[in-house]
């Protein structure tokens, strides 16, 4: 849907004047910019006819961006930043987990954000990404001969809120107006002609330099819906390079404790070997006095565990979508790493059909983003509009009594979305409520990820359960979350926009999904136990309050003793592991207090009617 355009009174947009917009694939290894010219989408190359590497080298008197920077990585590793996409939206603790894969010196900034120490001082991942985006913007404006109105920038489907916000911040630093963040698999589907009325279910297999995404899409005329997404935020072609580099270290008898320069050189050798093996049966490698031959078969054995990880994510996504492999009408391959023959064979074996590789897998995402950018800029395409429906990768919810996770927006819900649920107070006279926002698939708070906390104050004091608090979750098209809470009686409201100070650690999303399946049975039992404990505690507090208020007036000593004995029995099993035992004691306490509850009700009615005439009651 086109963005709203506003003109001065009496003016109208020129119908044949195109507004300049681009699509940007901000990749881990390479970054591309594409646009529409004469109705055709094309990638805008550098003057040398290639795409810039996602690399920035900082020098005392300036900086270099692209392939020139990447070429210097082996001789100046501490000042040359590669694969910065892996650092976007992450904290210093996450960076330390990556260990030897990142040969940089890090400093901790505000909110535990990592900064890379360079000769120009500390640089954040956002600043590094902005350098790459700035080069892409300038190239586009030079090629198109004008100023850009904006860009659609692609991100992995599994980027969380912090990573998406970091991408937007980098674009802002680069002087770019972000029309939209678009999931990379979504962009690939657009590039393959969604707007031409294709129908059916399609799998997008996206294996780039640093991330893997699988999306199951339903394509119908004018509507694009993502049925399910999955993937691995720490799996890509870089890992293939590391597998070969580790093999070289082993074969050459090198020490495992290598300095950054040697690491860079080995990775460059590995990357060249990987690319050569896509066309050749073997390749000769040399490092120092060592020389060896790496066959395609041996290479495929080295990467087989990595390929298997991608297939496992594919099967999980199919299960989430409720789709069998044979129902997939087409498999679209995205990302330079899908050129590896073993990867293509694996996808063909899983889905029982040859994957589509008609469009350059390195360019397909940028081209799809360019098509979407052209539409959002208001240029339109053949008078048609395109509806893109992305999904959130993990469930969003909040903490309820008993430290339980109450899901408000389930995972794989189509975005943008707004969902609301009503909650109430737990204690008499409660005037504030702490809202704890969570992300994850497990039943208990301790097994989910905390996103934010905020407090709603001003709740009118009343008995427990009387107040009504409506909590609304809103997720926009870019996956950013806003949570608000409103007390319906007083109108008091509080809200928070979730921009975590750091993102998920590598593999955390995959682990969270895996755990939700493995522990489903235990989680269900644990939730049932917690719910029963909360109900029992609420009953105990209510009965205790009733005894203090009316026990002396409405109960005989024997009746009171029986109730208190049953209360003590319930307290004795309250912290036990058996929900059924607690439920039995709750039922016994309810039965022994039934007569007491009836007397209290009668007393309340008599008090309400005392001194009133019959005609007053009838009125």
From Swiss-Prot:
Disruption phenotype: Essential, it cannot be deleted. GO terms for molecular function: ATP binding; ATP hydrolysis activity; ATP-dependent protein folding chaperone; unfolded protein binding. GO terms for biological process: iron-sulfur cluster assembly. It comes from Azotobacter vinelandii. InterPro entries: ATPase_NBD, Heat_shock_70_CS, HscA_NBD, HSP70_C_sf, HSP70_peptide-bd_sf, Hsp_70_fam, ISC_FeS_clus_asmbl_HscA. Coiled coil: none annotated. PROSITE patterns: HSP70_1, HSP70_2, HSP70_3. Gene3D superfamilies: 1.20.1270.10, 3.30.420.40, Actin, Chain A, domain 4 (3.90.640.10), Substrate Binding Domain Of DNAk, Chain A, domain 1 (2.60.34.10). This is Chaperone protein HscA homolog. Belongs to the heat shock protein 70 family.
């Amino acid at each position: 849907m086109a963005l709203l355009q506003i003109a001065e009174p009496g003016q109208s947009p020129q119908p044949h004047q195109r507004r300049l917009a681009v699509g940007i694939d901000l990749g881990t290894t390479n970054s591309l910019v594409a646009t529409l010219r004469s109705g055709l989408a094309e990638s805008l190359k550098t003057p040398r006819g290639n795409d810039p590497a996602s690399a920035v080298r900082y020098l005392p008197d300036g900086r270099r961006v692209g392939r020139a920077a990447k070429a210097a990585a082996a001789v100046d590793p501490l000042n040359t930043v590669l694969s910065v996409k892996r650092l976007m939206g992450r904290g210093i603790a996450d960076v330390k987990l990556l260990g030897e894969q990142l040969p940089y010196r890090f400093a901790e900034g505000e909110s535990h954000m990592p900064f890379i120490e360079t000769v120009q001082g500390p640089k954040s991942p956002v600043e590094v990404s902005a350098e790459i985006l700035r080069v892409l913007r300038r190239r586009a404006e030079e090629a198109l001969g004008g100023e850009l109105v904006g860009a659609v920038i692609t991100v992995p489907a599994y980027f969380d809120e912090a990573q998406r916000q970091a991408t937007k911040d980098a674009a802002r630093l680069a002087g770019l107006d972000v029309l939209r963040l678009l999931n990379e698999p979504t962009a690939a589907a657009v590039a393959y002609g969604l707007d031409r009325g294709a129908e059916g279910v399609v799998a997008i297999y996206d294996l780039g330099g640093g991330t893997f995404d699988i999306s199951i899409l339903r394509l119908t005329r004018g509507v694009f819906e993502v049925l399910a997404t999955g993937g691995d935020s720490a799996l890509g072609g870089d890992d293939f390079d590391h597998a070969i580099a580790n093999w070289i270290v082993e074969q050459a008898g090198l020490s495992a404790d290598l300095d950054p320069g040697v690491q860079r050189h080995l990775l460059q050798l590995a990357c060249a070997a990987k690319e050569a093996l896509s066309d050749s049966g073997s390749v000769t490698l040399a490092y120092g006095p060592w020389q060896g031959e790496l066959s395609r078969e041996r290479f495929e054995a080295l990467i087989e565990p990595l390929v298997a990880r991608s297939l496992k994510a594919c099967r999980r996504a199919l299960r989430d979508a409720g789709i069998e492999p044979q129902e997939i009408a087409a498999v679209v391959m995205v990302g330079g790493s899908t050129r590896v023959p073993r990867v293509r064979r694996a996808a063909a074996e899983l889905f029982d059909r040859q994957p589509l590789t008609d469009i350059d897998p390195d360019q397909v995402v940028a081209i799809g983003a360019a098509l979407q950018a052209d539409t959002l800029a208001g240029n339109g395409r053949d008078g048609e509009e395109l509806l893109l429906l992305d999904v959130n990768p993990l469930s969003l919810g909040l903490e309820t009594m008993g430290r339980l996770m109450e899901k408000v927006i389930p995972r794989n819900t189509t975005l943008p979305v707004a969902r609301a649920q009503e909650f109430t107070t737990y204690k008499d006279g409660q005037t504030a409520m702490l809202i704890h926002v969570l992300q994850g698939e497990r039943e208990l708070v301790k097994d989910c990820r905390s996103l934010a906390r905020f407090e709603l104050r001003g709740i009118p004091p009343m008995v427990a359960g009387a107040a009504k608090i409506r909590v609304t979750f809103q997720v926009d098209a870019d996956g950013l979350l806003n949570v608000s809470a409103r007390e319906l009686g007083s109108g008091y409201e509080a809200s928070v926009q979730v921009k975590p100070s750091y993102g998920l650690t590598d593999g955390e999303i995959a682990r969270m999904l895996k755990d939700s399946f493995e522990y489903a049975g235990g989680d269900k039992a644990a939730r049932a136990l917690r719910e029963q404990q909360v109900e029992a505690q609420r009953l105990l507090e209510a009965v205790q309050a009733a005894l203090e208020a009316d026990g002396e007036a409405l109960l005989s000593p024997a009746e009171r003793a029986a109730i208190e004995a049953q209360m003590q029995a319930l307290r004795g099993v309250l912290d036990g592991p058996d929900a059924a035992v607690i439920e039995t004691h709750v039922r016994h306490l309810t039965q022994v207090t039934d007569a007491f509850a009836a007397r209290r009700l009668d007393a309340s009615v008599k008090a309400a009617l005392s001194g009133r005439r019959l005609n007053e009651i009838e009125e």
